[in-house]
A protein has these predicted regions:
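Short beta-strand scaffold positions
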Residues: 6, 41, 77, 97-100, ...
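Conserved SAM-binding loop
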Residues: 14, 75, 119
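Extended low-complexity acidic/polar segments
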Residues: 1-2, 55, 61-76, 127-136
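Acidic catalytic patch
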Residues: 17, 71-92
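Acidic, PIN/NYN-like endoribonuclease modules and their adjacent C-terminal/linker elements
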Residues: 1-3, 103-136
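Short, well-structured N-terminal submotif of metal-dependent ribonuclease cores
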Residues: 1-40, 53-66, 115
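Alpha-helix capping/helix-boundary segments
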Residues: 10, 45, 82, 102, ...
Length: 136
């Protein structure tokens, strides 16, 4: 089964039509809807996408949560293994911790038997770190 792990920037771009990456984000989300594809988001990255909507009010937050449910995006709970992996990535790279969690979630999925894992991110540093730390 294929897996798409979202970095928060893709879903923020998807939700905000004024975002510079909106069109590309919509395309990435649509591509992730292919049959037999799981969609994942780290709980840390979930909190990132909620910040703006929480500031905007309950309706905006509810809109985000409805979108996640509509597209069956699984929120991956941060357990000790994922936290250790994110910390190791953070220690070895210049990535900020939330970005390390996006990458750690993708690598975690790969280590748990998923052989077709894609990390959806607009952050070149995240994608570069993924290629360096976990080349396919």
């Amino acid at each position: 089964m294929a897996v798409v792990v979202f970095d928060s920037d893709v879903l923020i771009g998807f939700l905000n039509p004024a975002d510079a990456h909106h069109t590309e984000a919509v395309a990435l989300v649509r591509e992730s809807l292919a049959p037999a594809t799981r969609r994942m988001l780290s709980a840390v990255n979930y909190s990132e996408i909620l910040i703006g909507p929480i500031k905007a009010g309950k309706d905006a937050r509810d809109h985000v949560e409805a979108m996640l449910g509509h597209f069956s995006i699984e929120i991956m709970i941060v357990d000790m293994a994922l936290a250790r992996r994110a910390a190791a990535i953070r220690a070895r790279t210049d990535l900020k911790l939330p970005d390390a969690y996006a990458l750690a979630t993708a690598i975690h999925a790969e280590h748990n038997g998923h052989d077709d894992v894609r990390l959806a991110s607009f952050d070149k540093a995240v994608l570069r770190a993924h290629a360096e730390l976990h080349p396919n």
